[in-house]
């Protein structure tokens, strides 16, 4: 289905507004203000600000270079080539190379003028200011990403719960008919969610981090532990009492998967369970010994899983998505 994105709308409105303002100011080459606006509208506020600064700096540098080259050497096509040969590496060195295209337009304006005057330089500065200013104005609006981030969070939490349910079932029954589709799916979800959360950070000029991004980083580390413990779980060939105890623990843990932080409760329960294991009679067979060793290792992995969550300060409950 055909859909017009918010960035397309902002670009169209911004371009028209920049050209209109330039015409009102009776600027020469007024259409170039629209080109500058198009180039400066980016997907995030921080990206737009960085691009605007790079283009403004590059354009100011281009005016200075143009004056030196054209007035001292002459208005000749080969002079433009020589100018760009020196100008482009300098913009790269100064890390304002994003402004090469915009500044090249300004250079061509000055070349076509046939004679650089203070009035014409002021005309170009106004074009640059209008184009960049309108782009920054358009980028003041950025749609909220909260709904998408919450949807990702819920799906990841649901997948964690499914994985834990399968671990619980295996420890209780030894059945292993799970397709495991949630593993690659969760990996993909976490990657996409982190990218989206980073975009959200970039949309807030005065904010360098946010809870959503840290939340998905936390889940990523926890998921690495889940992937690591799965082979250990499936190596257990018999059902033992300790396995049933861990299964009950995992059942309660999966019921409490949420963005808040209650890890300390489960860490205490885990410590108590570890002590209880140590006080139980020694295994009678080799199989039981191997099963209990694997389960003890599983306790250590679950502890790491919970420690990671304990460092996260939590996200307050959000309203239903509806």
Swiss-Prot record:
It is a multi-pass membrane protein. One of its GO terms (cellular component) is plasma membrane. The keyword Nucleotide-binding does not apply. The chain crosses the membrane at residues 24-44, 68-88, 100-120, 125-145. This is Uncharacterized protein YqjA. Its main location: membrane. It is found in: Cell membrane. Keywords: Cell membrane, Membrane, Transmembrane, Transmembrane helix. InterPro entries: ArAE_1, ArAE_1_C, ArAE_1_C_sf, UPF0421. It comes from Bacillus subtilis (strain 168). The lineage of its organism: Bacteria, Bacillati, Bacillota, Bacilli, Bacillales. It holds the Pfam family ArAE_1_C.
């Amino acid at each position: 289905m055909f859909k017009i994105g918010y960035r397309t709308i902002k670009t169209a409105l911004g371009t028209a507004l920049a050209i209109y303002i330039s015409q009102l100011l009776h600027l020469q080459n007024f259409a170039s203000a629209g080109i500058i606006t198009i180039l400066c509208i980016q997907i995030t506020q921080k990206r737009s600000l960085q691009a605007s600064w790079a283009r403004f700096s590059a354009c100011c540098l281009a005016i200075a270079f143009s004056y030196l080259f054209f007035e001292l050497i002459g208005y000749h096509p080969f002079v433009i080539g020589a100018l760009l040969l020196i100008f482009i590496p300098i913009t790269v060195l100064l890390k304002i190379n994003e402004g090469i295209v915009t500044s090249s337009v300004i250079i061509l304006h000055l070349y076509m003028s046939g004679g650089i005057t203070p009035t014409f330089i002021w005309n170009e500065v106004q074009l640059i200011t209008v184009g960049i200013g309108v782009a920054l104005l358009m980028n003041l609006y950025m749609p909220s990403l909260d709904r998408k981030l919450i949807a990702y969070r819920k799906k990841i939490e649901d997948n964690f719960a499914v994985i834990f349910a399968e671990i619980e079932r295996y420890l209780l029954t030894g059945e292993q008919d799970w397709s495991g589709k949630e593993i690659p799916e969760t990996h993909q979800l976490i990657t996409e969610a982190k990218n989206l959360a980073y975009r959200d950070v970039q949309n807030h000029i005065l904010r360098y981090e946010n809870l959503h991004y840290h939340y998905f980083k936390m889940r990523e580390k926890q998921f690495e532990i889940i992937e690591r413990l799965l082979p250990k779980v499936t190596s257990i060939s018999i059902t033992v009492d300790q396995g049933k105890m861990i299964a009950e623990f995992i059942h309660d843990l999966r019921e409490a998967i949420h963005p808040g932080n209650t890890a300390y409760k489960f860490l205490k329960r885990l410590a108590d369970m570890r002590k209880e294991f140590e006080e139980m009679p020694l295994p009678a067979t080799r199989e039981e010994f191997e099963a209990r060793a694997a389960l003890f290792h599983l306790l250590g992995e679950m502890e790491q899983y919970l420690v990671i969550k304990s460092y996260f300060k939590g996200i307050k409950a959000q309203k239903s998505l509806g």
